[in-house]
Amino acid sequence: MLTQQLGVLHASGARGFFVPGNHDWDSMQPGGWDAIRRQERFLAATGGGATLLPAGGCPGPVVVDVGQVVRLVALDTQWWLQEGPRPAGPTSSCPTRSESAVIDSVRGALRSAGQRVVVVVGHHPPVSGGVHGGHFGWQDHIFPLRNIKPWLWIPLPLIGSVYPIARAEGISSQDIPSRAYGRMRAALDSAFAGSPPLIYAAGHEHTLQVIAGTSTRYVLVSGTGTFGHIDRVTALDSTRFARSASGFMRVEFLSDGRARLGVIIVDHAGNAAEEFGLWLN
């Protein structure tokens, strides 16, 4: 899959940033830190303008300025949730070695942005109407095995409710209701409070969501770049757009700082069309 993504990037001639998530960290396995460093070496070996941000398993933030118009602030949010080895403490070679140092650096990156529009990118969204947000449908309660294999339509009423209820109660650190995830959200909210970014862009959920944020103007969840790999989604009170469909999002920045979002849906024939558009500022 990574090779296919790189092929698209190389063909376009664009500069690409890969922001790590839980799967890049080998799904929280003890060897996750080694896995993310192997991926970094692979990207470097392919050339063509692909960069892992942040690198080395470091939490970030890494700041990339695009002239005087846009400031990109990249975070490795899995660093906060990783249960195995990670670069932290006095032995770490990362610029930020603790959670408090990360937050201080994020706060500084926002305050020093000047007139630039700030976009924060991190794999895990702060809010979501998807399964990681604890939102499950009736099918999850009746046919829970479909979360393992989509074709396992085996009804397990009552017993099947154990899985979605446990997820909604935060049994997994990859879910928003969990204690570890909540601590990360609260820390980032405190960093954003003084100078809220325009956009927090995330993946994690296999959905397309545009949500009006609290500590950030908009939360963009775009996680269906792999065709057919989609999950259900629930519209929240703050949702501006939500779809369970394959596609991606595009944000265009004008020289005067205005930003326009386009949500692109892709069909089985490979045709792409904008289904939702919004001026963000």
For each predicted feature, which ranges?
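Extracytoplasmic
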Residues: 176
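The feature captures the conserved acid-bearing segment of alpha/beta-hydrolase catalytic domains
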Residues: 181
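Extracytoplasmic/periplasmic solute-binding protein
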Residues: 123
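A short C-terminal boundary segment appended to hydrolase-like catalytic domains
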Residues: 212-215, 239-281
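Conserved active-site segments centered on acidic
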Residues: 204
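Active-site neighborhood of glycoside hydrolase catalytic domains
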Residues: 188-189
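Extended active-site neighborhood of metal-dependent phosphoesterases/phosphodiesterases
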Residues: 1-118, 129-172, 193-199, 207-243, ...
